[in-house]
From Swiss-Prot:
Matches recorded under Gene3D superfamilies: Adenovirus Type 2 Hexon, domain 4, Hexon Major Viral Coat Protein, domain 2, Hexon Major Viral Coat Protein, domain 3
Quaternary structure note: Homotrimer. Interacts with the capsid vertex protein; this interaction binds the peripentonal hexons to the neighboring penton base. Interacts with the hexon-linking protein; this interaction tethers the hexons surrounding the penton to those situated in the central plate of the facet. Interacts with the hexon-interlacing protein; this interaction lashes the hexons together. Interacts with host dyneins DYNC1LI1 and DYNC1I2; this interaction might be involved in intracellular microtubule-dependent transport of incoming viral capsid.
List of residues that carry N-acetylalanine: 2
Subcellular location: Virion; Host nucleus
Protein name (database record): Hexon protein
Note: All late proteins expressed from the major late promoter are produced by alternative splicing and alternative polyadenylation of the same gene giving rise to non-overlapping ORFs. A leader sequence is present in the N-terminus of all these mRNAs and is recognized by the viral shutoff protein to provide expression although conventional translation via ribosome scanning from the cap has been shut off in the host cell.
Length: 905
C-alpha cells in the first residue's frame, strides 16, 4: 500500500454537522447501485435479503450466520480475553457489521439489588404496627400484645378446630363480617403470637420462612397461653395464643425509628418504625458500555491478517468509542425505543423529578373514610314505650342488640392528593438529596463507607427541604439537586428495562449479544484470507454493571462469571462473479474503504479542584487546518473511571458514567469561556454581541438585558448553540428539522426556569428562620424527617412567606437553566480563519497554513467536590483500510490537526 506521503494531498473542508460517515470512490458507488436490487451495501443496519438460488460460492455463503469458536480463551482476574481465527474463503466477503460476540455466564447482582419500590411483605401494615407478640416486662415478667380473630370454644386442650398447632390457627383467617365482634358476640377466639425470645420488628416488612408445607413458621415447640377478659368473673379462658419462635427477617426494609438496645425487648420496642429499602435496579449498561475493553496499552483488540500480522486496530486514550456510538445511534434511530438484543435502552430520567412543577394539589373537596358498619359511633340503648304521659322500658319482643349512633356518621379525613404529592417528592427527590443534607437517626449505626447500600439506606433527609410548600407555584429544580446526577434514580426507565431483562432475582444467568463499536472495523468488508481477531472483556462489576443508586458494587457483593464467548458473523449472500468483482475492486487502493469516526474528536480531561472557579488550558502550536471546533462539558471525578486500566481501584461507583454514555448534567455550571490564539487576531471577532475572544454563557446580574428566554443564558450563547447544532441563527429563529433535534440536541434539553424569592433587602421584617425552626403541618408531620413518626400539635405555619395575595411580600426574580445530555459546542473552520472584524477593509488572517498556539480559560461555578473539564477537540478522524492481498489488512489513521495520541502533544 502506498505510504501516506505518496497519497494525494487531502483537501480540507468545513463539514456542517456530523452526518458525513463513509467516503466511497465513484466506482464503488456504481457497484453498490448495481447490486442494490438485492443488497444494500451502504446501509449499516442492513435489510434482510434472500440469497441467490444458483451460482453461489458454497453452501456456507447461504447460511444466515456462522459461529466462530475461540481458539484461545484467557480468564484473568480483571478481564476475559478471547481470540478467534476468521477464515474467509475465496469468492466470499465477510460482513464485519453483522458480527457480534455471543457471551454466556452467571451474574450475582449482590444484596444491594432491589428491583422494586416499597416492600413485598405486609405492605398494608402501618409502619410502626407490631406483630402479635409477647414482650419482656420488669424482671422475668412477660407482657402480651395480640389480636385473636379465629373463633371457637376454648378448653384446657386448646381449640377443637385446631388439630395441628404447627400451622393452625392460621393468621390470615378470621371472621368475614364486620358484625362479628361488634353487634354479634365473637365468643372465644385464638391466634398466633411470637415469643418474647424472637426479636422485635414492625409488622411492615417482616417475613419468616415456612418450616412445613402447610405454611407453619415455628422453629421450635409451639406453646399455648390462655387469657380471660379481666371483667369476667368466671374462671374460663376467653382467648388463646399459640406462641412460637420464628426466623424473623426483614428482606427489604430497615428501621428509621429505633430504640436503644436496652429497650428493644420491652414495651418501647413495639413502637419502632420501619421503612422500605431504597430501590436499586442493577443491569448491564446501555449497549454494554464498558464491557469491551478499548485501550492502547497492549490489551487492545486485534484484527490482523496472518500474512502480514499488522494490527488494524489502533485505539487511542483520547478516542471516544463509547460516546461516539451513543451519538451515532441517536442520529440513526429513536433512542426512546428499547431494543433487547443489544441491551439498547438509553438512560433517562423523569422530567417531573428533575424539574418540579409544583402547582399545588387539587384538594378542594375533602376525602373521608368511614367505619365498616357505615354508621357510628354506636351507643347501647334500651327500648322504651309510652305509658300515659311518661316512658317506661319496653320488654315486649325486644332483642338484646339495641345500638344507635347519635349525630352524623363517624368519619376521618385524609388529604389524599397532598399525601400523594408529598410522598412523590419524598421518594423521588428528598431521598436523593446530597448526603450533607441528611442525618443518621438515633440508635442507628451507619457504615463507615458512604458508597455502600447499607449507608445510603439509613440516611434520612431533613424535613422542610423538599415539601409541597417549597417553591409552590413555580417550575423550578431544587438548587442543591442541580449538581446531583439525575440518571442515578429508580425512575431511570432505561436502566429499569435493562435490569428487568436479566430478571428480578439476585442470582441470574445471562446470554447476551455484544456488538463491535470500534469505528474502523464495525463497518468493514473483510476480503478472503485468514485473520486473527482478538478482544478483551472487563469483569469489573462497577464498570460493566449500572445501578440506580451508584453504590460500590464491589463492596456490596456483586460478581460476574463469564463461561463462554463465541463470535457470530455473516457472509454476503452473493453469486460467484458478484463476490469476485467486489473483491477485485476493493483490492484496488483507489477503492480503499474509508471510515470516519462519528464523533471525530480528540478528548482531554482537565481536573477542576473543589471550589475552583477558573481553569486555564493551553494547546501547543500546531496547524489548525481541518479543525472543526470544540465541544465541552463538565463531569464529576468520582463518576469517571480510568479507561486505560481494566480495573480502576479508585472507581468506587456504579451509576451512569457521563464520560462514556452521554448522561451529562453539569453543563449549566459554566459561566464563560475565552479563546485566544497566539496572534493579534481577535477570534471569533467582534461581529457578535459580546467581547471578542470571549463567550459568555450566563449572567447572574443582567443590567443590559443580554439574557434570553426567561433564563440567565445570554443571547450570544443561545445564538452560538443554535448555529453549532442546527445552523439556525442569522436567518432568524425557527425550530430545527426533526432529524437534527434528537435526544442529545441543544433545544430539546434546554430548560429555562424562573421563580420569585423574598426581597430580603427591602422587606424590613424578614426573619431568616432556619430549617429546623420552620413548621408547616405541625402535629401532622415529623419535625425531623418525612419518614419519622408524626409529632407536635396543630398550629399556624410560620413558613414560607406568602408571595401572592393582598399580603404578598416584596420579591426578587431568580432565573436559571438546565441543559442536560448536551455538549456545549463552539464551531470553528479553516473557512473562518479570517473572523476578525468582518469588513472588507479590516480582516486579519489567521493563516491556516501556519502554526498557532491556543489558550482557553473556562470560568465555572464552584462545586464542593473535584470535577473534570471534558473538552472534545473536533478533528478530521478517518481510518483508511487497504486489503491488497489475501490475508493482508493495512490501515492508515488520519487525524488532523491532532495526529498524535492526545491533544497536548
Amino acid at each position: 500500500m502506498a505510504t501516506p506521503s505518496m497519497l494525494p494531498q487531502w483537501s480540507y473542508m468545513h463539514i456542517a454537522g456530523q452526518d458525513a460517515a463513509e467516503y466511497l470512490s465513484p466506482a464503488l458507488v456504481q457497484f453498490a447501485q448495481a447490486t442494490s436490487s438485492y443488497f444494500k451495501l451502504d446501509n449499516k443496519f442492513r435489510n434482510p435479503t434472500v440469497a441467490p438460488t444458483h451460482d453461489v460460492t458454497t453452501e456456507r455463503s447461504q447460511r444466515l450466520q456462522l459461529r466462530f469458536v475461540p481458539v484461545m480463551q484467557e480468564d484473568g482476574q480483571y478481564t476475559y480475553k478471547t481470540r478467534f481465527q476468521l477464515a474467509v474463503g475465496d469468492n466470499r466477503v465477510l460482513d464485519m457489521a453483522s458480527t457480534y460476540f455471543d457471551i454466556r455466564g452467571t451474574l450475582d447482582r449482590g444484596p444491594s439489588f432491589k428491583p422494586y419500590s416499597g416492600t413485598a411483605y405486609n405492605a398494608l401494615a402501618p409502619r410502626a404496627g407490631a406483630n402479635n407478640c409477647l414482650f419482656n416486662g420488669s424482671g422475668a415478667n412477660i407482657n402480651t400484645l395480640a389480636q385473636v380473630p379465629f373463633a371457637g370454644a376454648i378448653t384446657v386442650n386448646g381449640q377443637a378446630a385446631v388439630t395441628d398447632n404447627t400451622y393452625q390457627p392460621e393468621p390470615q383467617l378470621g371472621p368475614e363480617s364486620w358484625v362479628d365482634g361488634t353487634l354479634a358476640d365473637l365468643g372465644d377466639a385464638s391466634g398466633r403470637a411470637l415469643k418474647a425470645s424472637t426479636p422485635r420488628m414492625p409488622c411492615y416488612g417482616s417475613y419468616a420462612p415456612p418450616t412445613n408445607e402447610n405454611g407453619g413458621q415455628a422453629t421450635g415447640a409451639v406453646e399455648r397461653r390462655f387469657y380471660k377478659v379481666t371483667t369476667n368473673n368466671n374462671n374460663e379462658a376467653d382467648a388463646l395464643l399459640y406462641t412460637e419462635d420464628v426466623n424473623l427477617q426483614t428482606p427489604d426494609t430497615h428501621l428509621v425509628h429505633q430504640v436503644s438496645d436496652d429497650q428493644v425487648t420491652g414495651v418501647q420496642g413495639l413502637g419502632q418504625q420501619a421503612a422500605p429499602n431504597r430501590p436499586n435496579y442493577i443491569g448491564f449498561r446501555d449497549n454494554f458500555i464498558g464491557l469491551m475493553y478499548y485501550n492502547s496499552n497492549g490489551n487492545l483488540g486485534v484484527l490482523a491478517g496472518q500474512s502480514s500480522q499488522l494490527n488494524a486496530v489502533v485505539d487511542l486514550q483520547d478516542r471516544n468509542t463509547e460516546l461516539s456510538y451513543q451519538l451515532l445511534l441517536d442520529a440513526l434511530t429513536d433512542r426512546s425505543r428499547y431494543f433487547s438484543m443489544w441491551n439498547q435502552a438509553v438512560d433517562s430520567y423523569d422530567q417531573d423529578v428533575r424539574i418540579i412543577d409544583n402547582h399545588g394539589v387539587e384538594d378542594d373537596m375533602p376525602n373521608y373514610c368511614f367505619p365498616l358498619s357505615g354508621m357510628g359511633p354506636l351507643t347501647n340503648m334500651t327500648a322504651m314505650k309510652v305509658n300515659n304521659q311518661n316512658f317506661q322500658t319496653d320488654n315486649t319482643n325486644v332483642g338484646p342488640i339495641q345500638k344507635i349512633g347519635f349525630g352524623n356518621v363517624e368519619a376521618m379525613e385524609i388529604n389524599l392528593n397532598a399525601n400523594l404529592f408529598k410522598g412523590f417528592l419524598y421518594s423521588n427527590v428528598a431521598l436523593y438529596l446530597p448526603d450533607a443534607y441528611k442525618y443518621t437517626p438515633d440508635n442507628i449505626v451507619a457504615p463507615a463507607n458512604a458508597n455502600t447500600y447499607a449507608y445510603m439506606n439509613v440516611r434520612l433527609p431533613a424535613a422542610n427541604l423538599i415539601d409541597t410548600f417549597v417553591n409552590i407555584g413555580a417550575r423550578w429544580s431544587p438548587d442543591v439537586m442541580d449538581s446531583v446526577n439525575p440518571f442515578n434514580h429508580h425512575r431511570n426507565a432505561g436502566l429499569r428495562y435493562r435490569s428487568q431483562l436479566l430478571g428480578n432475582g439476585r442470582y441470574c444467568s445471562f446470554h447476551i449479544q455484544v456488538p463491535q463499536k470500534f469505528f474502523a472495523i464495525k463497518n468493514l468488508l473483510l476480503l478472503p484470507g485468514t485473520y486473527t481477531y482478538e478482544w478483551s472483556f472487563r469483569k469489573d462489576v462497577n464498570m460493566i454493571l449500572q445501578s440506580s443508586l451508584g453504590n460500590d458494587l464491589r463492596v456490596d457483593g456483586a460478581s460476574i462469571n463469564i463461561q463462554s464467548i463465541n463470535l457470530y458473523a455473516s457472509f454476503f449472500p452473493m453469486a460467484h462473479n458478484t463476490a469476485s468483482t467486489l473483491e477485485a475492486m476493493l483490492r484496488n487502493d483507489v477503492n480503499d474503504q474509508s471510515f470516519a469516526d462519528y464523533l471525530s474528536a480528540a478528548n482531554m480531561l482537565y481536573p477542576i479542584p473543589a471550589n475552583t472557579t477558573n481553569l486555564p488550558i493551553s494547546i501547543p502550536a500546531r496547524n489548525w487546518a481541518g479543525f472543526r471546533g470544540w465541544s465541552f462539558t463538565r463531569i464529576k471525578q468520582r463518576e469517571t473511571p480510568a479507561l486505560g486500566s481494566p480495573y480502576d481501584p479508585y472507581f468506587t461507583y456504579s451509576g451512569s458514567i457521563p464520560y462514556l454514555d452521554s448522561t451529562f448534567y453539569l453543563s449549566h455550571t459554566f459561566r464563560r469561556v475565552s479563546i485566544m490564539f497566539d496572534s493579534s487576531v481577535s477570534w471569533p471577532g467582534n461581529d457578535r454581541l459580546l467581547t471578542p475572544n470571549e463567550f459568555e454563557i450566563k449572567r447572574y446580574v443582567d443590567g443590559e438585558g443580554y439574557n434570553v428566554a426567561q433564563s440567565n443564558m445570554t443571547k450570544d450563547w443561545f445564538l452560538v448553540q443554535m448555529l453549532a447544532h442546527y445552523n439556525i441563527g442569522y436567518q432568524g429563529y425557527h425550530l430545527p428539522e426533526s432529524y437534527k433535534d434528537r435526544m442529545y440536541s441543544f433545544l430539546r434539553n434546554f430548560e429555562p426556569m424562573c421563580r420569585q424569592l423574598v426581597d430580603v433587602t427591602n422587606y424590613a421584617t424578614y426573619q431568616s428562620v432556619t430549617v429546623g425552626h420552620q413548621h408547616n403541618n405541625s402535629g401532622y408531620a415529623s419535625a425531623l424527617s418525612t419518614f419519622n413518626p408524626r409529632e407536635g400539635h396543630p398550629y399556624p405555619a410560620n413558613w414560607p412567606y406568602p408571595l401572592i395575595g393582598v399580603n404578598a411580600v416584596p420579591t426578587v426574580t431568580q432565573k436559571k437553566f438546565l441543559c442536560d445530555r448536551t455538549l456545549w459546542r463552539i464551531p470553528f473552520s479553516s473557512n473562518f480563519m479570517s473572523m476578525g472584524t468582518l469588513t472588507d477593509l479590516g480582516q486579519n488572517l489567521l493563516y491556516s497554513n501556519s502554526a498557532h498556539a491556543l489558550d482557553m480559560t473556562f470560568e465555572v461555578d464552584a462545586m464542593n467536590e473535584p470535577t473534570l473539564l471534558y473538552v472534545l477537540f473536533e478533528v478530521f478522524d478517518v481510518a483508511r483500510v487497504h486489503q491488497p492481498h489475501r490475508g493482508v489488512i493495512e490501515v492508515v489513521y488520519l487525524r488532523t490537526p491532532f495526529s498524535a495520541g492526545n491533544a497536548t502533544t
